Design a protein with these regions (language model features):
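Hydrophobic alpha-helical segments, chiefly the membrane-spanning helices
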Residues: 1-461
Length: 461
């Protein structure tokens, strides 16, 4: 086991090394040279990478870092509650999305009142809504389908075969009920965000406060001592506790730093390549850039599912959706206000209001699918088809491939209505399951609060 584990770690690190060399030669060494007071010039070969070369190098770094990140999270489950380890993984995996959105929010504040500032505010919202819809439309739906149809799915205890066409389901861990309820609260609030003229301090207080409450609850959860790992996590979990914790921290820090530095040039490289073949820049920023920034998360989830840990994979996706739907939205107004030099609402136009409503409506429908702690092939396909059809229809309108009697904004509102109607029907038909879910979550929160300052114990304790 030791040789195979070290070989896997070495292979993952090797994928990241080209980008480490580029960053070291073009950013780190020049900074050190300037600090030390002498001149340094990066090699021309590394300083002038072509767009395609940049995409390849950064893409490999993202791939390798995603594996390191997944191993760190799985190893950490020996010492902290699984939900908390996955929450850390989720935040680190989507850190680049925060960075890209923060950049647009900063520009919106720095250039407030100008066309550039107005556009930046709209781009911040477009990037955020694109990322959130990708996470459900491709992430939740795609992983459910991959879990059921992948080779060896019969050995996955989460996959349940049922009679009927496309009736097989992925059964989810009931422990994710907490995340589902918190996500529902954030979703209901999100419907109200556009009504205030933009993202304001009340949005920040509620959404960030909601996520802080969630973290407070899961931190008081119990460590699961019987988690059966194989491969790299099993090897690392055999380390003595101090060495194990140090290794986890190192893996989280290294992979998180590489993902943070690599995804932005990876996304921009994809944008440039897309624009070169005629794809509009706004469309690229809303869809291609977020897809690139979500790539580490999706890679981690596919890795977990491939190990027959589909429940952990879904937990990671739901945790990512929760932190992006709370922390990401809530912190945009903070960044905008810092750039502005005073408190200010992050404003956006009506089309972006429609984007937020559509994103909230999609989330509402997706949550309705999960309240029985399972998702079928039919339901996953419905999520995927609704998502893809809206994106392709909007793209066709932008490119004037089709002519419709409605605008792109009207399409957003129509799809929002479809999601809300479908979600409402499901909530009504599954009201008993929803009631049980709420009661279970209330009990979980009550138990966590009643433990006071008690901390979870390591599996070694």
């Amino acid at each position: 086991m030791r040789r195979r584990a070290l070989g896997a770690i070495s292979a993952a690190v090797a994928l990241t090394l080209p980008w480490v060399v580029v960053v070291g030669a073009t950013d780190l060494l020049p900074w050190l040279a300037t600090t030390a007071g002498f001149e340094y010039r990066a090699p021309a070969l590394l300083a002038t990478l072509a767009t395609l070369e940049t995409v390849i190098v950064t893409g490999l770094a993202v791939l390798g870092s995603a594996f390191l990140l997944a191993w760190a999270a799985e190893t950490a489950e020996k010492d902290v509650p699984q939900a908390f380890a996955i929450a850390v993984l989720a935040v680190l995996a989507v850190a680049p999305e925060y960075a890209v959105d923060a950049l647009y929010a900063w520009n919106a504040g720095q250039f407030a009142g100008t066309p550039r500032g107005i556009e930046a505010g709209n781009l911040a919202v477009a990037n955020m809504t694109g990322a959130n819809r990708i996470l459900i439309g491709i992430g939740w739906a795609g992983v459910a389908l991959f879990t059921i149809f992948r080779r060896g799915s019969a050995a996955d205890p989460a996959v349940e075969k049922r009679p009927g066409v496309l009736s097989d389901v992925v059964v989810l861990d009931r422990e994710i009920g907490l995340e589902i309820v918190f996500l529902l609260l954030a979703t209901l609030w999100a419907f109200l965000v556009p009504l205030n003229g933009g993202i304001d301090i009340f949005d920040m207080l509620f959404l960030v406060g909601l996520y802080v409450c969630y973290i407070a609850v899961i931190l008081r959860g119990e460590v699961e001592p019987d988690m059966d790992h194989v491969g790299v996590p099993a090897y690392l979990q055999r380390f003595p506790k101090p060495a194990r914790i140090a290794t986890v921290v190192l893996l989280f820090a290294y992979s998180g730093a590489l993902i943070f530095t690599a995804v932005e040039p990876f996304a921009h490289g994809l944008e440039t390549l897309g624009e070169g073949v005629g794809i509009p820049s706004f469309f690229m920023i809303q869809w291609i850039a977020p897809l690139a920034s979500e790539a580490p998360e999706l890679i981690v989830v596919v890795y977990l599912v491939n190990k027959a840990r589909s429940t952990a994979g879904f937990n990671a996706l739901i945790s990512s959706k929760l932190n992006q739907w709370t922390l990401l939205i809530g912190t945009l107004v903070v960044v905008h206000s810092l750039a502005l030099g005073q408190y200010g609402v992050l404003a956006f136009d009506f089309k972006q209001s429609a984007e937020i409503w559509l994103t909230a409506a999609q989330s509402f429908f997706a949550i309705a699918l999960l309240i029985r702690f399972e998702i079928s092939v039919r339901e996953a396909l419905t999520l995927l088809v609704l998502f893809l059809s809206q994106v392709f229809l909007e793209f066709a309108l932008i490119r004037e491939v089709v002519a419709l009697p409605v605008s792109s904004t009207d399409i957003l509102l129509i799809y929002s209505a479809i999601y809300v109607v479908l979600g409402t029907v499901l909530f009504v038909s599954r009201r008993r399951a929803f009631g049980r879910l709420v009661r279970r979550t209330a009990g979980t929160v009550g138990d966590a609060m009643s433990t006071g300052g008690e901390q979870p114990h390591s599996a070694d304790d």
